[in-house]
From Swiss-Prot:
This is UDP-3-O-acylglucosamine N-acyltransferase. Gene3D superfamilies: Hexapeptide repeat proteins (2.160.10.10), MurE/MurF, N-terminal domain (3.40.1390.10). The active site is at H248. The keyword Nucleotide-binding does not apply. One of its GO terms (biological process) is lipid A biosynthetic process. One of its GO terms (molecular function) is structural constituent of carboxysome shell. Its EC number is 2.3.1.191. NCBIfam families: lipid_A_lpxD, PRK00892.1. Pathway: Bacterial outer membrane biogenesis; LPS lipid A biosynthesis. It comes from Synechococcus sp. (strain CC9605). The keyword Acyltransferase applies. GO terms for cellular component: carboxysome; membrane. Pfam families: Hexapep, LpxD.
Length: 347
């Protein structure tokens, strides 16, 4: 694809094309990071990007740049084709769709798939080899169900969803439109519910369901449990990384992002637009307000106010945590000073 052709497509997107350089129009065969790109590949830079220095030595053929004069001047001096965008990262994401178009499987049902006669598969839906679909389940139109997916009884999958290989949807699960469940993820598994008795642990039946609203994406190996009663609900547009555990009865707002190894205990309430970085733990029944952010390995045991940034274990406001971390590194020196003061102080 010619760079000029790509830019014509991108100018209709959401990245905000400002202007593009005239005269240079390389043929692009793909994309790569700036330090690895060749003359037939596209890359991008953001304002203040740490790779700015690498531009001088890069063999990249074309660039998507921010409106930053030093980058524009350097690209011009090196004879690199470029276009300037308000959001070059978003432009790069849109460009990847053009450079690497996805191949959609044919809308047919593989003969090895096992589909209950009372299940419904919508028009345009592709069902791969060894898929199992249980009684009363309903798949919407234009879905893609990859090999080995298991859909239990009474599951509802909205239009345009994609279920990757070996994903499992347990009974009663509900998926809205455009959801993606990646390989080996489990939606609607039994919640961790047991009642202590004199004879040991008595299992609490988990009769509830999991609801994924429109546009939710679930990463590989992630599990989302159903509760004993009621529902576990994931808000529209929420993106969940690999290996995340979401307990029974959790509710999240719209547009959240949870990184790998996040664990959310049963009954927690997560607001809209919340970001939980890697390995964050949220205790049962904790409440996290809208747009709050928890940095990696934070342990949230109480409530987090809307818009607050927290860090550490137990989680505290990020600025306070930074001060505490700075103090912690000075503890050996402080202990030495205290010993000297004690030694020099008359008894």
């Amino acid at each position: 694809m010619r760079f000029s052709t790509l830019i014509k497509v991108l100018q209709t997107g959401d990245a905000g094309l400002r202007w593009s350089q005239a005269g240079l129009d390389p043929w692009l065969e793909g994309a790569a990071s700036l330090d690895q790109a060749s003359a037939a590949q596209l890359s991008f830079l953001e304002k203040g990007n740490a790779l700015t220095a690498a531009l001088g030595a890069s063999g990249v053929g074309a660039l998507l740049l921010p409106d930053q004069q030093d980058l524009i001047d350097l690209a011009s001096q090196r004879g690199i084709a470029f276009a300037v965008f308000a959001d070059p990262r978003l432009a790069f994401a849109e460009a990847l769709d053009q450079l690497y178009p996805r191949r959609r499987p044919l809308a047919e049902i593989h003969p090895s798939a096992v589909i209950d006669e009372r299940a419904v598969v919508g028009p345009g839906t592709a069902v791969g080899p060894r898929v199992c679909i249980g009684e009363g389940s309903r798949l919407g139109a234009d879905c893609i169900v990859h090999p080995g997916v298991v859909i239990y009884d009474d599951v509802v999958v909205g239009d345009g969803c994609e279920l990757h290989a070996n994903a499992v949807l347990h009974p009663g699960s509900r998926l809205g439109r455009g959801c993606v469940v990646n390989s080996n993820a489990v939606v609607g598994s039994e919640g961790f519910g047991f009642v202590p008795t004199a004879k040991g642990w008595r299992k609490m039946p988990q009769t509830g369901q999991v609801v994924l609203e429109d546009g939710v994406e679930v990463g590989c190996g992630t599990t989302i449990d159903r509760p004993s009663v009621g529902e576990t609900r994931i808000g529209a547009g929420t993106k969940i990384d690999n290996l995340v555990q979401i307990g029974h009865g959790v509710t999240t707002g719209r547009g959240c992002a949870f990184a790998s190894q996040v664990g959310i205990a049963g009954g927690a309430r997560i607001g809209h637009g919340v970001i939980l970085a890697g390995q964050v733990g949220v205790a049962n029944r904790a409440v996290v307000g809208d747009r709050a952010i928890a940095s990696s390995k934070s342990g949230i045991h109480g409530d987090v106010a809307p818009g607050e940034v927290v860090s550490g274990f137990p989680a505290i406001p990020n600025r306070l945590w930074l001060r505490c971390a700075n103090t912690f590194s000075k503890l050996p020196e402080m202990a030495k000073t205290l010993r000297e003061l004690k030694r020099d102080t008359p008894q």
